[in-house]
From Swiss-Prot:
Protein's name in the database: Probable chemoreceptor glutamine deamidase CheD
Species annotation: Geobacillus thermodenitrificans (strain NG80-2)
UniProt xrefs under CDD domains: CheD
GO biological process, one term: chemotaxis
Record's keyword terms, sorted: Chemotaxis, Hydrolase
Superkingdom of the source species: Bacteria
Catalyzed reaction equations: L-glutaminyl-[protein] + H2O = L-glutamyl-[protein] + NH4(+)
InterPro entries named among the record's database cross-references: CheD-like_sf (IPR038592), Chemorcpt_Glu_NH3ase_CheD (IPR005659), Cytotoxic_necrot_fac-like_cat (IPR011324)
Annotated function: Probably deamidates glutamine residues to glutamate on methyl-accepting chemotaxis receptors (MCPs), playing an important role in chemotaxis.
Organism placement in taxonomy: Bacteria, Bacillati, Bacillota, Bacilli, Bacillales
EC numbers: 3.5.1.44
Similarity section: Belongs to the CheD family.
Gene3D superfamilies: 3.30.1330.200
One GO MF term attached to the UniProt entry: protein-glutamine glutaminase activity
Length: 165
């Protein structure tokens, strides 16, 4: 039996795979792992989003995969270019944890995880891509792996608990 190939997505990266290849990203704390897929075509794209808005970039060229407001649409385009059908696309999300406690005076700026999740969902809604499952928030880091053949997203938390959505 042949081993299934796994493509790794690094921080602020996005990639697309076709089954039987699976796609994985590690180290999701406040970052969000976004999977956009077409189950009928057994293909999926994943982005490892770090921050909510590209307006936070400091000059130069913006890495689209790094920011929720640019990554979702760019990932959607990659999935369609690989053969995905816009009307059939669905999304799954994981991450967006609040990894550290801050005093209430730090306000909204320190809610990076929650703001990442909110912006990813806003962009998916704008593109009419339904979120069919999610495992977001909390205080634990996650590693996720998506199998485009089965449509299952496996989530391993820092405590080694594994969940499938």
């Amino acid at each position: 039996m042949r081993a299934i190939e796994t493509v790794k997505v690094g921080i602020a990266e996005m990639k697309v795979v076709v089954a039987p290849t699976v796609i994985r990203t590690c180290g999701l704390g406040s970052c969000v792992g976004v999977v956009i897929y077409d189950s009928g075509k057994a293909l999926a794209g994943m982005a490892h989003v770090m921050l909510p808005h590209s307006s936070m970039a400091r000059g130069g060229v913006v890495n689209e995969a790094k920011y929720a407001d640019t990554a979702v649409e760019a990932l959607c385009k990659l999935v369609i270019a690989a053969g995905g059908r816009k009307a059939m696309l669905k999304a799954k999300l994981a991450g967006g944890a609040q990894m550290f406690s801050f005093s209430s005076t730090s306000g909204d700026m320190m809610r990076i995880g929650a703001r990442n999740v909110e912006e990813v969902k806003r962009q998916l809604e704008r593109l009419h891509i339904p979120v069919v499952a999610e495992d977001v928030g909390g205080h634990s880091g996650r590693t996720i792996e998506f199998n485009p053949q089965t449509g299952m997203l496996s989530i391993r938390t820092a405590s080694q608990e594994i969940k499938e959505i």
